[in-house]
Amino acid sequence: MAGEIFVSESLVIRLGTNAQQPVEWLVWSAKEEEIIASGILASAHALGELRERAGGRPVVTLVPGSDLIFRRVSLPGKYSRQAAAALPYLLEEQIASDVDELHLVVLGHEGHEVDLMAVDKEKMQIWLGWLQQAGLKSQQLLPDVLALPPAADGWSALQLGKEWLLRQGPCQGIVADESLLAMLLAAEADPVTIHSHTPLPAIPAANWLAADPELPMLLLAKGALNCQANLLQGPYRPQTEYSRYWLQWRKVAVVAGLLLLVALTQRGMHLYQLAEQDKALKAEIRQVYTRIFPGENRIVNVRSQMAQHLKLLGQTPQDGVLLLLTELAPTFAEVPGLKPQVLRFDAARGELRLQVTAPGFAEIERFRELAGKRFEVQQGEGAQHRGQG
């Protein structure tokens, strides 16, 4: 029933080389050790009929071993991920196909020896396309010959129609009709022991033994469910629920990350600008101080030293007078001959009274004119002293 989860039940499908070939399927219960349902579809176009059968069951797909290449190659050193990069070139020495068009999967390795299976990438796309169009998601895709039970002292065999499926070892297998199989067996140096799960053929040059008889599709289904080989690796690896969820939200996460980066950059720029402004302000305050008190070169704490000067001039330090002096600093700089002698600041009235000395009245008038551009200036009576101009 669709929507239910069958933990111990699996749907095993055996595809053909082309879409017109029949598709066998079987639902097997490992817990009950029985066939729940089985059948044959007319072609791959009818795979959609198995969507309800799949339901909450894992789907395992068998593909024709005749469409794959099985080879053993030798590496210069021991197998590693770095050494695996050389496998396509080593395989290219043994086959006539373009290795760039092949999907390679490592079945096993021991020392310098590596067992591979390879299939055309185009064929992979065809098989996966059939399943996708049918709404089926397979968690494993493996060659049917590796679903045969391995034989400890030889090969295992199964006849399907006019073809023989033979498993020659843990990572090796072939598919051949009777005439080709007879030629292959005749080429063996010593007779091969073959355990057949279907009636024995009349093929000499081999030691044929009858294995336990079993329904071909059931035999393959059981073997597939116990086999680790899987063509769904690399670019064909099925997505987990987490991966699908992540792919859906990846763009959102990227945009959010970019926005956060922009925000942090702007914040950093703002803090940098504030730091630069603070540095500039401190430099300006030092300039103001040196303009008002040009004779003092050692400046450690501008605020403290300014307060000391104000005390000497008879004025209690206040923020207001510091601000006014800061704004008047450029004016003092324009009239270098004019020097403040006494300051009086009335915070309530916002009024600063200055008693200054200058070489002459021209400097005082110049100071009044410049300060008058920003402040309201009233000039009191002046007195001329000897030695002052």
UniProtKB/Swiss-Prot annotation:
For this protein, the record's NCBIfam families field holds:
typeII_sec_gspL (TIGR01709)
Q: Give all cystine bridges in this chain.
A: none
InterPro entries (alphabetical): ATPase_NBD (IPR043129), GspL_cyto_dom (IPR024230), GspL_pp_dom (IPR025691), T2SS_protein-GspL (IPR007812)
A single GO cellular-component term from the record reads:
Gram-negative-bacterium-type cell wall
- Output this protein's name: Type II secretion system protein L
Species whose genome carries this gene: Aeromonas hydrophila
Q: Does the keyword Thylakoid apply?
A: no
Keywords recorded for this protein, A-Z: Cell inner membrane, Cell membrane, Membrane, Protein transport, Transmembrane, Transmembrane helix, Transport
